[in-house]
């Protein structure tokens, strides 16, 4: 399902992210400008519901702040020293294995708030950018992730206790001077993990409110 970067009504302009509707039945509304914010929001909600969204979130205008907070998206940064004893075997994702990598991460991240679903049409871009890996040790899959330059875009472990090995293995490729990532405020387990790894919260990037 395609997104609407510009959704124009007589009440104002918004952008609609609908790509998660087929997977998570979620839609995201960002109000760009509003002459009548209540009416604009209602039109956006109505459209999102019409295409199948059951959970709808919004941001971009003070009007939506009266609704329950769903989550905030936090930025975390830090200088991380790779612990070599925790580095395992890295298998670069290829055209033949991109689907398997994508499916694994989607399954692991589906319960996480604001975690976007990886689609097959985005595989080539990931391959072109590089930095996507499986992490193995002794013939067993420990996890997978995607490190693009200094940004850790995705990471998931295949079993409890493997997170640190996956983390240090991914960072061993380029050893960025300062690592950056984004995490939902509701993902407290991940935040605690990243803090143990040496990262700190540096900014609140945006807030999403549950409007339906």
Predicted region positions:
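Short amphipathic alpha-helix that is part of the acyltransferase structural core
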Residues: 1, 83-117
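Conserved donor-binding loop and adjoining core beta-sheet/short helix segment
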Residues: 1-43, 136-160
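Active-site rim helix/loop that mediates acceptor-substrate recognition in acyltransferases
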Residues: 1-8, 110-138
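Short glycine-aromatic motifs
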Residues: 5, 12, 65-69, 130-131, ...
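Acyl-donor-binding surface of acyltransferase catalytic domains
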Residues: 31-89, 166, 173, 179-181, ...
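Alpha-helical elements of Rossmann-like donor-binding domains used by nucleotide-donor carbohydrate transfer enzymes
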Residues: 43, 100-104, 165, 169
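Compact recognition or signaling/catalytic modules
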Residues: 122-212
